[in-house]
Structure formats: C-alpha cells, structure tokens
C-alpha cells in the first residue's frame, strides 16, 4: 500500500521554491516546532527563521526559511516565507560573517540597535550555517 501524501508548497515573494507531494513536513513555528502528516487538523501559524524539512519517499529535503507563515488544510501544507533557500544556494562564508555581525550588534547593547531585527538576523544566519553544513559533510 502506498504511503499517504499531502501537497506541499513553499512560496516566497520571488518564487515557488518547492511544490510536490510529501509524507511529512517539519517547520519551526514561533511557539515551537511543528510536524504535519497527511490529514492534519487545519492550522495557521507564524514561522520563525530556521530549517524546514520535508520527507518524501523516505528521503529528506531541507530548506532555510526567514520567517513567514504556514497554513495546513485539506491535505495541503502551504508555507508563505519571507525568503527561502536550498542548502546548495547558501554562501557559507557570507552566512558566517552575517552571524558575526549580528552577534556583535547584540553584544554592543547600543540603545540605537534594533534588537528584534538583530536577533532575527542571527537566527537566519545560524539556520543558513546549519543547512549549509548538511551538504558540506
């Protein structure tokens, strides 16, 4: 018997980065990690920057999302991401520099610094480094 699947889409303002059937989707919601199998209860959640993983036919695909929203209903998972990329698209050196910059901003404790923005930049950089490391091994 074939495994049940659900339609999964990852959409950014620039492109559709993924659109296919999948068995399982894992995202990082703002209130914690979420996993979706076919037939999941309808849900809408905001996403924090981090890894998004999709399982199809026993194989995992990883993406980095820079926040956004996920909607689950009628055996469909739609991710509307501010930005998203595949690990092979990531410039690891650039991500490491972005992480250093964000850490310096946060450590400076300058009242002029937008702390929320700096924390989001740090989370994005860490997720990009983590994803890039998965393909560099």
Swiss-Prot record:
GO cellular component, as recorded: plasma membrane; proton-transporting ATP synthase complex
Primary residence: membrane
Keywords assigned by UniProt, alphabetized: ATP synthesis, Cell membrane, CF(1), Hydrogen ion transport, Ion transport, Membrane, Transport
Keyword Calcium: no
Domain of life assignment: Bacteria
Keyword Membrane: yes
Function: Produces ATP from ADP in the presence of a proton gradient across the membrane.
Protein name: ATP synthase epsilon chain
